[in-house]
Amino acid sequence: SAILIVLVVSLASCSNRQTGEVSVKEDLIAKQLLQGIWVNDETEMPLMRIEGDTVYYANPQSAPVPFKVVHDTIYIYSNEPVAYKIDRQTEYSFWFHSLADEVIKLHKSENAEDSLVFTSREVEVISTTPEVIKKDSIVTYMNTRYRGYVYINPSKMKVFKTSYSENGISVDNVYYDNVIHICVYEGKKMLYGQDITKKMFADIFPAEMLDQAILADMNFMGVDSKGYHYQATLGIPESSVYNLVNMIIGFDNTMNIEKAE
């Protein structure tokens, strides 16, 4: 029983590592057996190609990820590291337990045409804003008319978001973030202007959330005695999860940022 307790504690300490790292030596023979293209037994469709230390998925929107094999487990070092228990491994078959507790059964491809699925090494980055979006609003405060502008600009800054297939396989999709320009005018006179990125919200959101979010939207809310009011939307791509951020720019052009309640 003493040996069992030590083993349980050892496994718990390994699984608690945030990066999914394991301290024991990886199985290089098992890794060598995994080299090649693997096809789903049920659909006969290529699922992934393993080359060296990297898994390449058939879906061109899924980013390649490094991996290791330790004992009977394959560790995938994606944006959110995961581990799959290996149920069966031979030179031509590979079965593993998905996160949905399904046994994924694969066999090694012997069809040369399957390699065509993996011809492109470039990941297809998903654009959340295909073109510049312009918005403007007019408000009146203390008998003065103010016009607030918003320009939502697509950028080349990449956001990696982990998603899961119906059968419980984790993949990283890549999206382009936005840079949003805001400015306030009184007549033809610009009172304030600045480019906004999600990095400006690092003090009010945890890094884990901010890393997978995009700066999705911005609205000019009005003017009062405190200054010019904007509200930003931070969203997780292809989900209903979002957070609102209130931004107040004082008449001295100092900005106050706080999470909307």
Identify the role of each PLM range.
Residues 10-13:
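C-terminal motif of bacterial Sec signal peptides marking the signal peptidase cleavage site
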Residues 15-18:
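Bacterial signal peptide processing site
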Residues 20-24, 101-129, 238-261:
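Edge beta-strand at a domain terminus
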Residues 22-46, 120-135, 141:
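Tryptophan-anchored aromatic micro-motifs
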Residues 40-83, 171-188:
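N-terminal glycine/threonine-rich, aromatic-flanked beta-hairpin/loop signature
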Residues 94-96, 146-149, 226-236:
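Short beta-strand elements that form the blades of beta-propeller/WD-repeat-like
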Residues 102-162:
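Surface-exposed beta-loop interaction hotspot
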Residues 191-210:
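Surface-exposed loop and turn segments in beta-propeller and other repeat-based domains
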